[in-house]
Structures are given as C-alpha cells and as structure tokens.
C-alpha cells in the first residue's frame, strides 16, 4: 500500500528501559542495527500496527510496554533505487513513518525475538539514547535522528546536553553485551 507520492505507511518503535536506554535489534545475518519498524496494513491504525510489529519483531505484548509519546506527523526517508525491488521501481520512493516512544514495563526476559516464524532480528541490546547512528543503514539515519530528537521531550534528560554524542564508539562492546535468543 503506497500513498500518492510513493511512500509506504509505516511505524517505527523506540523502546526504552528504565534507564532511558534504547532497544536496538541486529538484522538477521547482517551487521546492521535498527529500531523495530514495519508497515501499516490496510484498515490498521498506526497504534494497532505498532503493537503488531512490537510483537512480531520483539515478542512484546501491550502489557509489557507503556506508550510515552509519538511523533506529531509522518517522518519520511527515500530508499536508494538499488534497494528497491525491480517491480516497484518508478512507483515506490520510500517509507513514511509515525514513530512511537515506549517504556518497557515488563522485564528484559519478556523480549522474544522468535515470537513468530519470521524473525527480523537475531540479537538485541540496550544502548545509550544518543548513541551515534553509524551502525544504522545510511538512508535511515536522518529519520532516526528526527524521531529521537522529537521524542526525547517525553523522557527525563538534561536538555542542555548534546543531541548526538560523536565521541562514543557505536556498538563497540556488542560482542560482550549482545543478548541473543538461544
């Protein structure tokens, strides 16, 4: 389902723990990390799609989280042509997303990357909210930054601090701290 401009409606999920660290999932058989996200099906509201995607990708149910906020409008990114399926070229531009900020009220052990038979991630970890976005595929970085900046107002942070810390090495300790489903 594409809109008139060629964007697929989608939801993005920033899941925080009690320390305001964010959930990052490692794409299966890739070394790229991302927030959970997915398409909005015909007839679904963004919130319904968010809860469906949260379960499909992270295995969490509505009772495991609390919605803290969402973006006011759609955030868009274009997908480079070489990433677009041949049959979609010419009509598909990219994704437009409503982003949700969630607080995990359950336990880390509630995360189940194999809740469905088509897992999206093979590992996950908590990261600092302002971790550099170098490990995110390049064409999504600006939308991630926009979502993080817009939604931070719902968290208790020192608002005078930098938006993105450049000095921190992204995912440098991933081998030691990846939590994967065995």
From Swiss-Prot:
GO terms for molecular function: pyrophosphatase activity. Its EC number is 3.6.1.-. Keywords: Hydrolase. Its cofactor is a divalent metal cation. The keyword Hydrolase applies. Signal peptide: none annotated. Residues 162-182 are annotated as: Disordered. CDD domains: NUDIX_Ap4A_hydrolase_plant_like. A motif (Nudix box) lies at residues 38-59. PANTHER family: GDP-MANNOSE MANNOSYL HYDROLASE (PTHR43046), MUTT_NUDIX FAMILY PROTEIN (PTHR43046:SF14). Belongs to the Nudix hydrolase family. RppH subfamily. Accelerates the degradation of transcripts by removing pyrophosphate from the 5'-end of triphosphorylated RNA, leading to a more labile monophosphorylated state that can stimulate subsequent ribonuclease cleavage. This is RNA pyrophosphohydrolase. It comes from Dechloromonas aromatica (strain RCB). The lineage of its organism: Bacteria, Pseudomonadati, Pseudomonadota, Betaproteobacteria, Rhodocyclales.
């Amino acid at each position: 389902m594409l809109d008139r401009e060629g964007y697929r409606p989608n939801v993005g999920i920033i899941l925080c723990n009690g320390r305001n660290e964010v959930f990052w999932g490692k794409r299966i058989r890739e070394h790229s990390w991302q927030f959970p996200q997915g398409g909005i099906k015909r007839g679904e509201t963004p919130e319904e799609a968010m809860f469906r995607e949260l379960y499909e990708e992270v295995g969490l149910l509505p009772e495991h989280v609390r919605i803290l906020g969402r973006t006011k409008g759609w955030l868009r990114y274009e997908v480079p042509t070489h990433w677009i399926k041949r049959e979609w070229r010419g009509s598909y531009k990219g994704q437009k997303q409503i982003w949700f900020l969630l607080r995990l009220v359950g336990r880390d052990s509630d995360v189940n990357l194999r809740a469905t038979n088509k897992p999206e991630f093979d590992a996950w970890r908590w990261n600092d909210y302002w971790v550099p976005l170098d490990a995110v595929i390049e064409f999504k970085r600006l939308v991630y930054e926009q979502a993080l900046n817009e939604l931070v107002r719902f968290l208790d942070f020192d608002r005078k601090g930098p938006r993105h810390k450049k000095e921190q090495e992204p995912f440098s300790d991933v081998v030691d701290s990846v939590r994967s489903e065995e």
